[in-house]
């Protein structure tokens, strides 16, 4: 396009910020030391887990990082909440990776279960991290994409996962709210997802599954709600056990498997043979969505700042009591 009105005004607007006169190498060194410490902490959190990327690949699976990289356009990943760990979990995270990325040129918000850490189990603080992601998608009106591989709730810490206003149930309410607002929630589902990992069928717009994916509820409290009596007693438990024995004789599909959710319930919109197939399915549905065109509100072609960004290491002081000119920051 590059044909904008009032070029004499917008292309000759006054600049802000002054050239750096006195570099501060000591301040630069202190800031870069903090940056390096943050980068190292993020690396340790990403590397932590009970399995490795190599072992996952040997089993025919991709890691969360590999799935994200396969989904997004190269160089567009903007990770967020990388060190968020409000409950001090042992792997230094909440077992999910999330952030912004472009898929075929369109920005989306991505949440990926970290399958190196307890197969992506729900741990304390994860629900709040999911809400941070969903709230950002809501605010920016971006599609929310899950790469789900969740082994359910970490049992010893159930009391820290489910309760609370921003606890285990709220992300599902938020997903439903996004649907009502016209913000799609698209889920690619891998592996076995019992209990808390299986509830994502309740609220997403589209579910795309790996052929070996499984998604089912679990726990006596949940099963009791599915029983006509409203609770589980010895008789009901015996019925469940006997049904499992009988089903095993007739090769009835396991609860939550692809034959159930693709052929019967319709929760799975599409099923693919491998990890990358699921990614391609997600991309297909992203392509169906409209995209905001930056040209709509542009008044001039974007340009890099006139002043070098490297100057910020000298301008922004480590000593927070020292003043600085915010226009010098804006100018870079």
Language model feature labels by segment:
Residues 2-3, 12, 18, 148-294:
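Conserved catalytic cores of soluble enzyme domains
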Residues 48-51, 258-266, 303-313:
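Short acidic (Asp/Glu) and glycine-rich catalytic loops that position anionic groups and cofactors
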Residues 49-57, 82-85, 294-301:
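Short coil/turn segments at secondary-structure boundaries
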Residues 10, 270-326:
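Terminal amphipathic helices with adjacent charged low-complexity linkers/tails
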Residues 1-47:
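Charged, compositionally biased N-terminal leader segments and the immediate start
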Residues 56-83, 303-332:
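Amphipathic alpha-helical
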Residues 54, 58-186:
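Long, structured ligand/cofactor-binding scaffold of large enzymes
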Residues 41, 71, 133-136, 281, ...:
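Generic, well-ordered alpha-helical scaffold segments in large soluble proteins
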């Amino acid at each position: 396009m590059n044909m904008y009105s009032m070029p004499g005004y917008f292309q000759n607007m006054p600049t802000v910020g002054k050239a750096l006169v006195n570099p501060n190498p000591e301040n630069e060194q202190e800031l870069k030391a903090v940056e390096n410490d943050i980068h190292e902490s993020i690396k340790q959190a990403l590397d932590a887990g009970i399995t490795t990327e190599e072992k996952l690949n040997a089993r025919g699976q991709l890691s969360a990082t590999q799935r994200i990289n396969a989904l997004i356009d190269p160089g567009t990943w903007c990770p967020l909440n990388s060190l968020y760990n409000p409950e001090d979990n042992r792997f230094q995270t909440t077992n999910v990776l999330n952030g912004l990325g472009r898929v075929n040129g369109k920005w989306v918000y991505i949440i990926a279960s970290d399958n190196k850490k307890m197969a992506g189990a729900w741990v304390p603080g994860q629900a709040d991290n999911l809400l941070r992601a969903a709230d950002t998608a809501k605010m920016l009106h971006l599609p929310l994409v899950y790469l789900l591989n969740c082994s359910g709730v970490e049992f010893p810490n159930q009391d820290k996962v489910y309760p609370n206003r921003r606890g285990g149930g709220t992300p599902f309410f938020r997903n439903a709210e996004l649907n009502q607002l016209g913000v799609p929630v698209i889920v690619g589902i891998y592996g076995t997802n019992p209990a808390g990992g299986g509830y994502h069928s309740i609220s997403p717009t589209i579910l795309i599954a790996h052929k070996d994916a499984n998604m089912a509820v679990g726990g006596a409290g949940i099963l009791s709600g599915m029983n006509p009596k409203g609770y589980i007693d010895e008789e009901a438990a015996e019925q469940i056990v006997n049904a499992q024995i009988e089903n095993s004789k007739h090769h009835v599909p396991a609860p939550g498997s692809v034959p159930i959710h693709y052929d019967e319930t319709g929760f799975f919109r599409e099923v693919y043979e491998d990890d990358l197939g699921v990614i391609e399915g997600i991309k297909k549905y992203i392509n169906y969505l409209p995209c905001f065109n930056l040209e709509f509100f542009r008044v001039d072609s974007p340009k890099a700042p006139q002043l070098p960004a490297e100057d910020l290491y000298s301008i922004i002081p480590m000593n927070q009591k020292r003043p600085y000119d915010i226009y010098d920051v804006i100018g870079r």
